[in-house]
A protein has these predicted regions:
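A cross-family phosphate/adenosyl-ligand binding-site feature
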Residues: 1-99, 105-177
Length: 177
């Protein structure tokens, strides 16, 4: 649910926000909620709109792309160039900086495969904000929580300082993974 707060705070800062939720994200938060928070229509699949090529338009229109939360599955698909959904296809199109905000169970976060996939993304100039430590889903605690919204915003916008005026930016948020 932090992705909803992220959208709200970015809008309060004067940025345009477009949300590209994964099917998993829509199981947690409905498209209507994302649309209400962002003030923009929500696309979740490549095939929803016949009047535009969604991943091309969305990817080209973004000044910054934030993937929050980024699951182990999403990280793996991005690291290996998958383009089988709107999120991954949009990542392949965008020239904007991409910020990855991992969120998963500690055992998954510490898994060698996840760490290797993150290294691949870092080599491609993706910016990774490490997960926070705290209570996880269920009764477990440890590393794996989505970073706090203020940290995500500060680190993400710092990537653009010096290159753009930091108001009225078009920020793409992908929710869930």
């Amino acid at each position: 649910y932090k992705s909803c707060d992220l959208i709200r705070k970015l809008k309060e800062l004067g940025h345009s926000v477009k949300v590209v939720p994964t099917p998993s994200a829509l199981k947690f938060v409905g498209a209507a909620t994302f649309e209400a928070l962002s003030g923009e229509p929500v696309s979740a699949t490549v095939w929803e709109r016949v009047d535009e090529v969604a991943h091309i338009e969305i990817g080209r229109g973004a000044d910054l792309m934030i993937i929050a939360p980024a699951t182990a599955n999403t990280i793996a698909r991005l690291a290996h160039g998958a383009a089988d959904d709107l999120l991954s296809a949009t990542v392949l199109v965008t020239k904007a900086p991409v910020v990855i905000c991992p969120a998963m169970h500690s055992d998954m976060w510490l898994n060698e495969a996840v760490q290797n996939n993150l290294e691949i993304l870092k080599q491609r100039q993706f910016h990774v904000i490490p997960p926070a430590v705290g209570r996880l889903t269920g009764s477990d605690s440890g590393v794996g929580r989505l970073p706090e919204v203020t940290e995500i915003i500060e680190e993400s916008l710092s990537l653009l300082q010096g290159s753009k005026i930091l108001t009225d930016m078009r920020i793409l948020i992908t929710a869930g993974g």
